[in-house]
Design a protein with these regions (language model features):
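Short Gly/Pro-enriched turn/cap motifs at secondary-structure boundaries
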Residues: 75, 239-247, 253-254, 274
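Conserved Rossmann-fold dehydrogenase catalytic segment
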Residues: 146, 174-183, 205-221, 241-245, ...
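Nucleotide donor/acceptor-binding cores
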Residues: 19, 211, 270
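Oxidoreductase and adenylate-handling cofactor-binding alpha/beta cores
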Residues: 190-210, 223-234, 286-293
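Aromatic-enriched alpha-helical interface/lid elements that frame and gate functional surfaces
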Residues: 251-333, 337, 344
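N-terminal helix-loop segment corresponding to the beta1-alpha1 unit
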Residues: 1-206
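Conserved PLP-binding catalytic core of the aspartate aminotransferase-like
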Residues: 339-352
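Short Pro/Gly-enriched beta-strand edge/turn motifs at strand-loop
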Residues: 57-62, 233-240
């Protein structure tokens, strides 16, 4: 490692050295956000109750397949680099201890992810804390935010993803909404939160004043569908499910590939994703498929008309080749393609 690389690595590891975070959050968005600070040199103390532990502690997979409050992979992944403090905040003496901790330890950031009622009932909300510590940056993130007619509704990433519109767009047009994998909004919101908190730190450096950051996970997730929302506002277009297709790319789908060895060892079928995004990519693919006659379909509008024929030709061509082979071949030809990989594929992926 050269001196520049070493300097950059040290800078990254110590980026938030001296920044203190008192973390009351649980499950996804809050813990992921505070982990950014912990991993980059900040000191994070996580407050958690044994009587009502983070529900993520009960989520599989567990170490050695044995369930336990300290054995969840998810719980560990999103809370490494932090210190833990067990405390039952339903008790006044615990809340008094928290206030003493804030007075003496002087955290820069307080993070919480409860519905508005909870921290208010404990008198640990922003209004209560900022009276004594106006420099505090107080980060709140629950599903619906601190205000509005549904602010008391609790929920997880799957619910926020559904409310934000992702489920209406994911799946096949003739089937029920499928939704994206997992608690989708849990992974969309932390970068937004991280940027907002950094901006608040910069503001405090200039003014000496903290502020309250209210990140509704529902609202944050909708930003990733901004083009669809703006299109509706513009001309009333309502987008819906189009399976594996893409409005601006044809062909764009997942095709079955050949891989007998994969089936023999119980890894299931082999699939390849292909996405032609430009007319020049289509020309290259048409030659590979032996569809020289289709070269005249140089625009996406032309290819839409013959989509079923094009898909059939791709399916036939892929049926005699493995997914990895197809991916490498098409990538070398300048055509976006990727093998559909399972966990076992990822484990053995030379790039990873």
């Amino acid at each position: 490692m050269n001196q520049i690389d070493q300097k950059n690595e040290d800078f990254t590891e110590d980026l938030f050295h001296g920044i203190k975070v008192l973390d009351f959050s649980w499950v996804g968005v809050g813990p992921i956000t505070t982990k950014y600070f912990a991993d980059l040199g900040g000191e994070v103390i996580r407050i958690e109750s044994v009587t009502r532990p983070d529900v993520l502690r009960g989520a599989p997979p567990f170490k050695d397949g044995v369930p336990g409050i300290n054995r969840s992979q998810f719980g560990a992944n999103w809370n490494t680099s932090k210190k833990g403090l067990g405390m039952n905040l339903a008790l006044q003496e615990s809340r008094d201890l928290v206030l003493k901790l804030i007075d003496e330890w002087k955290p820069d950031i307080i993070a919480e992810s409860f519905t508005p009622r909870v921290m208010k009932s404990w008198k640990l909300d922003y209004k209560s804390i900022s009276r004594l510590h106006p420099e505090i940056i107080y980060f709140s993130t629950c599903q619906m935010g601190q205000t509005g007619p549904q602010s008391s509704y609790a929920g997880f990433g799957q619910l926020a993803g559904s409310l934000a519109g992702f489920y209406s767009l994911t799946g096949w047009p003739d089937r029920d909404p499928a939704g994206p994998y997992g608690a989708y909004s849990d992974f969309l919101n932390p970068p937004i939160a991280f940027g907002a908190i950094i901006a608040a730190l910069m503001y405090r450096n200039k003014t000496g004043m903290g502020q309250h950051i209210d990140l509704s996970q529902f609202e944050g997730a909708t930003h990733f569908l901004a083009p669809h929302i703006m299109k509706y506002n513009d001309d009333g277009t309502v987008f819906s499910r189009i399976a594996n297709e893409e409005y601006e790319s044809i062909p764009h789908d997942i095709y079955p590939a050949k891989d007998e060895v994969r089936k023999m060892v119980g890894l299931g079928e082999s699939w390849i994703a292909i996405s032609v995004q430009t007319d020049s990519q289509w020309e290259s693919l048409a030659v590979i498929l032996g569809l020289e006659a289709a070269l005249r379909l140089k625009t996406i509008e032309g290819r839409k008309v013959y989509k079923s024929i094009i898909d059939s030709a791709i399916t036939e061509w892929c049926s005699n080749r493995g997914a990895q082979e197809i991916m490498i071949f098409l990538q070398n030809a300048g055509i976006p393609a990727g093998a559909v990989q399972s966990q076992s594929d990822l484990w053995n992926d030379p790039q990873l």
